[in-house]
Structure formats: structure tokens, C-alpha cells
Amino acid sequence: MAFRTADFSRLVRFNSANSCDFLELCESAWDKKIAEDDAKPKSRTIAPSSAYCMKQNWFRLRGVEPDKPKTSDRGLDFTAQVGTSCHENLQSLLKATLKDDWLDVGEFIRTNCTWYSDCEIEQHGLETRIAISNPPIRFACDGLLRWKEEIYLLEIKTSEFSSWDSLTAPKPIHIDQVKSYASLLHVNHVLMIYQDRQYGGLKCFELRISDEEIKATWDTFYYIVDMADKNLPPKGLPSGDSRCSASMCPYHKKCKEW
């Protein structure tokens, strides 16, 4: 039987007491930042990212605590930071290239959205964060642009290479989300850019949201609010749906109790 020599070099993370202490300083600072982010109060609003499940948004509006609190995870935080960097890079490139055809989201809302007087708009770099009071919704817009004589909503998604490489259409879990964004902004056309976080590859898919879909989306928002006011849970996802799991839904356990 042959024995392999262990390669302990892969386990080495520091080479002196000073480097050990400095590594601990870096990791402690990172953990503190993540914990502070996790401790921020959760808003009782509809989240378009959960638009595929009315019941999940019902729990959010009711202020129900998730099944288990979030814990510090440097891996997830790093992935989020990489995703943010990808967004910022693409947004900067597109703004510089499109010039006047890269639209001011705040101005577009003021001109085209009837709920403008009932919202707050914050600019974070080239991302626009929007909070509406009625119905209570918070969302972020990656961009609005004029392309081929149409107004398009831009949505940027990032993923690992293996997931990105197999994409031939928008991921189903993202469609309800972008449909919500488009409906809120009353925009019928969407360009979805998917970027591989490892090598930077890009794919782009177009979606069209009909006026009927926009109306149905708004009706759903108001229905969820009405059910939350009455403390009556709407229907959740059908049995067997892959998104109805403890890993995908923060209210999976509580959902079974309601």
C-alpha cells in the first residue's frame, strides 16, 4: 500500500505571530461588518426577488421572523461583493457608451410613474433604490436605457461559471422578479445580462412584458397587502416546487404551520 505525503503548505495561512494577529484582525473586522449588516432591521415590504411566492411576501409584510437568523458567512459576503463589482463595471461601461440613451431613473419615475409622490428615491452609484409606500415595496433598478427606439429596463445577474455556461434563457426564478420591476416602472421591454463571475463572460436575453401582465402584477401586489391586513395567508407554491425548500425560503418551516 502506497502512502502519500501530506501537503501541509495548503493549510498554512500565516508564517509568524505578527501575520497571525493581523489575519485575525482582518477576519474579525470582516465578521463585524457582516454581523452589523445582518442586524439591520428588516423592512416590512414586498420583495420583488420573492415575487414567485405570494406567501413569502405575506410573511414579510406581517413582520414574521425567518425560521432561523442569518449568520456571518464570509463566502456569501464575498460573492455579493464580486457581484456588486460586476454590476458597477457594466453600468459604467454602458453609461459611457450609450451617453444620453442611458436614462436618469429618478427623472423617468417623476415623469412616467403615477406613484412618484408616494416614493423615496436614493442613488447609489449607478444603481437607483426605490421605496414605495402604497403598496409597500422596495426595489433597486440597475438601469433604464433607450435602445432600438424602445425604453428597456436593464437587469444584471451574476453567477458561477457552471451555471452561466448552461444558460440558454433567463432563469425561471428571475422572470417574476424582473416582471415586477418592469411593472412597477411601467416598462414593457427588458434586457437581462448574465455575467460569469469567474471569467467575465456575458450573455444577454430579451423579455417583453405585456400590459396585461403589468396589470396582473399590480393586482397581485394589492392582493398580498389586503391578505396581510386581514391576516389571511395567500396560497404558497404548489407541492413539489423546487423553490419551496428550507434552502430557498426563509419561512419554509413557518409556512407549513400556516
Named regions from a protein language model:
Residues 156-170:
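Short beta-strand-loop-alpha-helix junction that forms the active-site gateway
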Residues 95, 99, 159, 187-190:
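Alpha-helix capping at helix-to-loop junctions
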Residues 1-153:
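Metal-dependent nuclease catalytic cores that hydrolyze phosphodiester bonds in DNA/RNA
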Residues 135-136, 170-175:
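Short, glycine/acidic-rich beta->alpha junctions
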Residues 4, 10-13, 166-171, 184-258:
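Metal-dependent nuclease catalytic regions and adjoining charged, substrate-binding loops involved
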Residues 63-64, 157-161, 195-199:
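Short connector loops/turns at beta-strand edges and beta->alpha or beta->beta junctions
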Residues 178:
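Generic structural marker for isolated residues within well-ordered, non-membrane alpha-helices
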